[in-house]
Amino acid sequence: MDIPPIESGAGMKIAVCAKVVPEQARRIDPETKRLDRSGEQTLNPFDANAVEEALRLKGDDAGAEVVLVSLGPERSLDALRKALAMGADRVVLVADEAAAGSDLVASSYALAQVLEREGADLILFGQQANDSDGAVMWAAVADRLRRPLISQVAELTVSDGTLRGKRQTEFGYDVIEAPLPVAVAVSDAINEPRYPSLKGIMGAKKKPQQTLSLSDLGVDADRAGEAGSRTEVYAIGEPPPRGETQRIDDDGTGAEKIVEFLLERKAL
Ligand SMILES: Cc1cc2nc3c(=O)[nH]c(=O)nc-3n(C[C@H](O)[C@H](O)[C@H](O)COP(=O)(O)OP(=O)(O)OC[C@H]3O[C@@H](n4cnc5c(N)ncnc54)[C@H](O)[C@@H]3O)c2cc1C
C-alpha cells in the first residue's frame, strides 16, 4: 500500500531521542562490567535516520521545531552538534554523574521525564543504539509516557493530527495510524541522512544547548544510575569454545580438502 506524500509539519514539535555512542569497537571494562565508553564518541548512526526524518517532517515550516533529547555525559554535546549541524534546532542533554550505570529501567525513566517536560507532538527514536543494540528503549519510554508507539517505521506521514506509519515486518508491511502525540522508532531503511553543510556546521555551536541535571528534572537519586537500575551484571566472559575445529588453509587444494572432510563425516 502506498502512503500519500507528506502534508506538512504544521507547527509540530518533534523530539528526537539521540544517543552518543563510542566510535571504536566495543569493549567491556572487566572492572565495572560495563561498556568502556572512554575514547572518541559519535552520534548513534541509527539516530541520524530519526534526525533526518524529523527535518523532512519539519520541511520549511518555521513554526515547527526539532529538539534533540539525550541522556549521557556532558561531553556528548560535541557529538550531538552533528545533529544540530544537520538542521535540528536545539539540544536538551541530561548529564549527571549520578546517572552513570543506568540500565534500561533508569535510563527510560530519566528520558521520559525530560520528554514529558518538552511535551512534543511526536517523539522519534532510532531503531537501536549501536553500542548496546537493545532496540527496546522506545518501547520503555512510550510505556512510561502512556503514548502509542509504532516501531520499525520505513515511511511516515502526518496529517490532521494523525500519524500514519508503514512498518516493516518479517512478511511484508503493516500500515498503522495513531493520533498525535505519538512515539515512533524509525527503521534505518526510512531515509538516507544528509551530510551537514559547512554553514550548518558553523551555525551548530550557536544553537541552544541545554544541560539538565537529574534534580532539574525532579528525578530522585534512587531512580537513577545503579540505584535506580534493576539489572545486575554478575560476570562477563568469552563465549564457550565451539568444540573440535579443523582449519583448512587454501593452497589451491582447499575445495578438495573440504569435500574430503565432508565425505569422511558422511555429510555429502
Ligand atoms: C548494568 C548496566 C549498566 C549500564 N550502564 C550504562 C551507562 O553507564 N551508560 C549508558 O549509556 N548505558 C549503560 N547501560 C546500557 C543501557 O542500559 C542501555 O543503553 C539502555 O538499556 C538502552 O538500550 P540501548 O542502548 O541498547 O538502546 P536501544 O534500545 O537500542 O535504543 C533505541 C533508541 O532509543 C534512543 N536512546 C537509547 N538510549 C538513549 C539515550 N541515552 N539518550 C537518548 N536516546 C536514547 C535512541 O533513539 C536509540 O536509537 C548499562 C546497562 C546495564 C545492564
List each language-model region with its residue ranges:
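N-terminal glycine-rich FAD/FM-binding segment characteristic of electron-transfer flavoproteins
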Residues: 2-268
